[in-house]
């Protein structure tokens, strides 16, 4: 059994992709120590929502990988013996993408949180895709696709 508590859970909440073993257990244990999960709070609320944070922070109860997955803290869960292979597959998938595109996707996801869909936002995102399409990484990626070869970053 693998335990992740307090700041470790907050670290998971800040990660782009989380894979957990079915044997993993989680706990927001700060209240047991007379503390509050203040530093990790913003990440937890974004990952699992305020209602779930309230429950698990005030009770300090332990929960398993299935609940962590249901809450959105964990993206994928697998048998303990399959953990390395599952992580490797995700790392390979990310590594196969354009490095600038990956950075741009991460930045865009962060910038869109909480923003309503307005004309201004539509204009910003249209400008972004136009700028990216004209860049060297996108040109290489599209050429590689059309030529049936791997792009240079792979």
Residue ranges and their predicted role:
Residues 5-58, 86, 90:
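CoA-thioester-processing core
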Residues 14-15, 71-72, 148:
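Structural motif
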Residues 16-17, 55, 59-61, 67, ...:
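Well-ordered beta-strand positions
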Residues 19-24, 74-123, 136, 152-154:
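C-terminal long alpha-helix characteristic of the crotonase
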Residues 41, 50-53, 84, 101-105, ...:
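A general structural signal for well-ordered alpha-helical segments in protein cores
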Residues 50-55, 63-70, 97-103:
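Short, structured loop/turn "capping" segments at alpha-beta junctions
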Residues 56-57, 68, 108-113, 127-133:
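Helix-loop "lid/cap" segments that line or gate small-molecule binding pockets
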């Amino acid at each position: 059994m693998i335990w992740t508590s307090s700041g470790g859970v907050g670290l998971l909440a800040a990660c782009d992709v989380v894979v957990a073993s079915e044997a993993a257990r989680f706990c927001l244990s700060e209240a047991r120590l007379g503390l509050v999960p203040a530093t990790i709070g913003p990440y937890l609320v974004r990952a699992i929502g305020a209602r779930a944070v309230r429950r698990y922070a005030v009770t300090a109860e332990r929960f398993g990988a299935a609940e962590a997955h249901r809450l959105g803290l964990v993206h994928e869960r697998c048998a303990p013996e399959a953990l390395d292979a599952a992580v490797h597959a995700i790392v390979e998938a990310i590594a196969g993408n354009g490095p600038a595109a990956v950075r741009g996707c991460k930045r865009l996801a962060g910038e869109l949180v909480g923003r309503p869909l307005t004309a201004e936002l539509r204009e910003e995102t249209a400008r972004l895709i136009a700028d990216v399409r004209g860049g060297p990484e996108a040109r290489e990626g599209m050429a590689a696709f059309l030529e049936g070869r791997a792009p240079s970053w792979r």
